Amino acid sequence: FIEEGIDIVVSTKDLPGEVMLDAEIFSWYINTLHINGVSTLLSRFVNSYKGIDYSVFYEELFEFLQQDAWWVREQAEVRQYFHNWMTQGRIRHPNVGGIEIHGWNLIHRTILHMHVEERYDHVFDLLERFMARYELPEDIMANLMRFQRLYLVAYRRVREYPMQLDLDYNIWEYLTAGAELANAPVRYRLEFPEDKAMSFPRFLELFYFARRRNFGKAMVDRIT
């Protein structure tokens, strides 16, 4: 049996260890919510509709989430595991849904917990409360949240794809094609372009191994 290891930088003269940990936490946070599609449509809409920079949106959201016990626990534990890795060379993290957690996939731990614990409603309810500060028109907000909740693919629903989403606004074109926001009925087709019969552990491990193909987010096409 031969152990493998890697060398990692844990601090520099300009980035002390604690600041490095802060950077690791912010990277984990952005990966969990924005990269994985949990808050992506919300941040993009606020940027386009209100002119609020992504950095402002995510700094404000980070502070808001410090009020939630589940999120704070996740954040504290991730920080401790990063600290273990940096100071002891091993994370010593329990498996999540049967998936081993190492230094290189620790950043995915919370999105895995969201799926394992089915925290979808908890997280999206938090995001909806946060979004209230931007005072979007009520009908736009309702449409946006419906879209966001379905944009993240929940494992329990993979066999329901493709699914149809009827909205009152052309939100997808507004965010991705520079179209004017129009109040008119639209119908989207949401697809999970993967093996719909995959096991739950396979689904979870693909958040790392299929990260370059946007795994975990629905593909969107306009029907009408």
Model-derived segments and spans:
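Terminal or standalone catalytic/regulatory effector modules within metabolic enzymes
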Residues: 48-201
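A structural motif corresponding to the C-terminal lobe/cap of the Radical SAM core domain
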Residues: 1-56, 60-61, 162-224
